[in-house]
């Protein structure tokens, strides 16, 4: 019988700018009576890194541009907030009432460039995504391996909407030490049919599973340890979450819209 387990780390302190996230993760694991083991996949909510990496900005420090003021009238959003989104974006894809859909500087297509204020202290303080989530994941993984002597993977996750589906789901936005995909193409199913398109984004599936414990409100569980997936995922040193992003030509939804 196959199985895996997920441990949501309780008692995690509020992260401050400059905090040593890997050291805190290892310490909280031990406080929970849990030792990190080889092949563990450590899923971390992006807000942890945003705080530690000083990616929290105050609206009072932001001066909106003409473009931000114009889009503010269209969206009904604070022009200073719109300016933050523009600074983090490559392209504005859609602007309408309460909606600002962009392609951000990391290549993610998302609402408000992933900027929000959930679990951020201060009414006008907002969290930006980590500057380079893959780099953050790699630094975290290497530090944890140095502290514990164990070979692990790290996934940084955030929550996004999906085309034509209600509700949001956790996705991987930064990865290190794990192959992003479980590729079934060329293999055969139970009846001998050759699989031609099955290439599962396993890091997104792991991120979604972890979100069941991380939650979105006051759960205060920003880190989940996933154990028992060594038969399902492959170790990979050089993976990047950019591999999950498809080109406009490949994007079926863009073609429909």
Indicate where each model-derived feature is located:
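N-terminal and secondary-structure boundary signal
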Residues: 1-257
